[in-house]
Curated annotation (Swiss-Prot):
Protein name: CTP synthase
Residues annotated for UTP binding in this entry: 13, 188-193, 224
Other known facts: CTPSs have evolved a hybrid strategy for distinguishing between UTP and CTP. The overlapping regions of the product feedback inhibitory and substrate sites recognize a common feature in both compounds, the triphosphate moiety. To differentiate isosteric substrate and product pyrimidine rings, an additional pocket far from the expected kinase/ligase catalytic site, specifically recognizes the cytosine and ribose portions of the product inhibitor.
Residues annotated as catalytic: 381, 507, 509
Binding site residues for ATP: 14-19, 71
Role summary: Catalyzes the ATP-dependent amination of UTP to CTP with either L-glutamine or ammonia as the source of nitrogen. Regulates intracellular CTP levels through interactions with the four ribonucleotide triphosphates.
UniProt family annotation: Belongs to the CTP synthase family.
UniProt xrefs under PROSITE patterns: GATASE_TYPE_1
NCBIfam families (UniProt xref): PRK05380.1, PyrG
Domain Glutamine amidotransferase type-1: 292-534
């Protein structure tokens, strides 16, 4: 039978519950315990698929096509496992399921209430994860902050859960903030005391306190928290601010988080095999070259909108013993006159995914700048579509080449709606979503990077390259380097005569890992590093001559 850890958060939002859950998953997995992590989100949307990135950050897509919270990306990257739609639960999906059951008569005419019907549905979703993969430990993060009205049904459900499955099979872990007050020159525990008091009023006594803080918790403060919150002092864990999220697992290991969790669950201690993770951190902390990469997007004011892209770039940089400096460029600011000012001097340009016409012209201009100036370029999803539009307009000389998404009556719709999307009315969960196979051209750069003929990548789109233009694009120098196995859908394009110009219809960033950088991001960063070294060499030669 699986054991269960519930991670709640107090005092403020965005405190790092997801990173704590992911880090605990890493530490337990390093001890050869199997782990699955799920997120309970208190918003009433069925999923985040139709939410603005400014509201929610990126939408993370799983192998089975679920549109989920970005925390699932952290879970997958830290534990190196593939999750599914079972690992993402929202209030909206719970109420939808309950109401569907009511319409079918499943409640036998009874009055449908939050307790027991909604709470039972929540508990069933948690148990479903345990039944699906039978992990040793299921870690559940409850979104929001203790005290929020939206989270109450989830908190009530996990309160009941310990009674249902047994006291020794459940751990309640509360992540809280210990603020540093500069004027007083001390850290304050009162917000945490009140947060725990709020949690107790719901009927949950935390077993472990994970204290987010700017400075290490001194023994006296740990003892104070232990006394006022009724938590053993060894279960008061310091989660000090770190320069990288990938340092957090090792920091929490030093604090004994995994050991305390296993003791509370009556599971035996095991030696943690963290050598690979320790090597990763050593590489991060002693980088060589610094590479400047421009991300040209629509939502650059909120970095979380492109979180997996940023992490995939970091993974590739770590593997190359380098570090990256990001130049965030709003696509709306890029035009013929400003492209040079925004993009000059960068070592590589990434145009990530997105939806809608706003900023598209700027993305197209940035792609032209990368192509003409031989700057390594990686386009993702809409980034591929924009690169096709750019080539159609500027090289193939197609009048008003465009996507039918942006211009319905364009005479040259080089990007068109997928046929199966023609009759789709609802927006949520109706795109081409999830893991699909892609067959690579053996004579392509993509093939040399992946090292295999058939690959699998995650998708999230409605539009594709219009095959009516495939021959023309090939004749003018474009290479289709990856397609669906039947050859119908173009999945990867590249420019053979460019230092590195690859664009994909899929989202490779979702399958990158800290210890296994994605091949396309690795290839892109290698090209960026090579370009920088060549520029440095050329600059040195000029200096020597002068």
């Amino acid at each position: 039978m699986s054991k269960f850890v519930f991670v709640t958060g107090g005092v403020v939002s965005s405190i790092g519950k997801g990173i704590v859950a992911a880090s605990l998953g890493r530490l337990l997995k390093s001890r050869d315990y199997s782990v699955s992590i799920l997120k309970l989100d208190p918003y009433i949307n069925v999923d985040p698929g139709t939410m603005s990135p400014f509201q929610h950050g990126e939408v993370f897509v799983t192998d089975d096509g679920a549109e989920t919270d970005l925390d699932l990306g952290h879970y997958e990257r830290f534990t190196d496992t593939e999750l599914s739609r079972l690992n993402s639960v929202t209030t909206g999906s719970i109420y939808q399921a309950v109401l569907n059951k009511e319409r079918r008569g499943a409640y036998m005419g009874g009055t449908v209430q939050v307790i027991p019907h909604v709470t039972n549905e929540i508990k069933e979703r948690i148990l479903r994860v345990a039944k699906d993969t039978n992990p040793d430990i299921v870690i559940t993060e409850i979104g929001g902050t203790v005290g929020d009205i939206e989270s109450l049904p989830f908190l009530e459900a996990i309160r009941q859960f310990r009674k249902d499955v047994g006291r020794n099979n459940v751990v309640y872990m509360h992540v809280t903030l210990i603020p540093w007050i500069p004027a007083a020159k001390e850290m304050k525990t009162k917000p945490t005391q009140h947060s725990v008091k709020e949690l107790r009023s719901i009927g949950i006594q935390p077993d472990v306190l994970v204290c987010r803080c700017h400075l290490p918790l001194q023994p006296g403060l740990k003892e104070k928290l232990s006394a006022f919150c009724d938590v053993p002092v060894e279960s008061v864990i310091t989660a000090q601010d770190a320069s990288s999220i990938y340092e957090v697992p090792l920091n929490l290991e030093k604090e004994g988080l995994a050991q305390q969790t296993l003791e509370l669950l009556n599971l035996g201690p095991r030696y943690p095999h963290l050598e690979e993770w320790e090597n990763l951190i050593r590489q991060m902390q002693s980088p060589g070259q610094k590479l400047e990469i421009a991300i040209v997007g629509k939502y650059v004011q909120l970095g979380d909108a492109y979180l997996s892209v940023v992490e995939a770039l970091k993974h590739a940089a770590i593997a190359l013993n380098s570090e990256i400096e990001l130049r965030w460029v709003s696509a709306e600011d890029v035009d013929n006159d400003s492209a040079e000012a925004h993009l000059s001097g960068v070592d590589g340009i990434v145009v990530p995914g997105g939806f809608g016409i706003r900023g598209v012209d700027g993305k197209i201009k940035a792609i032209e700048y990368a192509r003409v100036n031989n700057i390594p370029f990686l386009g993702l999803c809409l980034g591929m579509q924009c690169s096709i539009i750019e080539w159609g307009r500027n090289v193939a000389r197609l009048e008003r080449a465009n996507s039918s998404e942006f211009e319905e009556d364009t005479p040259n719709p080089v990007i068109n709606l997928l046929p199966e999307q023609a009759d789709v009315v609802d927006l949520g969960g109706t795109m081409r979503l999830g893991l699909y196979p892609c067959r690579l051209n053996p004579d392509s750069l993509a093939f040399s990077l992946y090292g295999q003929e058939v690959i699998y990548e995650r998708h999230r789109h409605r539009y594709e390259f219009n095959n009516a233009y495939r021959s023309l694009f090939f004749e003018t120098g474009y290479l289709v380097s990856g397609t669906s196995p039947d050859g119908r859908l173009v999945e990867i394009i590249e420019l053979p005569k460019h230092p590195f110009f690859i664009a994909t219809q899929f989202h490779p960033e979702f399958r990158s890992r800290p210890n296994k950088a994605h091949p396309l991001f690795s290839g892109f960063m290698k090209a960026a590093l090579k370009g920088r070294e060549e520029k440095f060499s050329l600059s040195s030669q000029h200096s020597a001559v002068s």
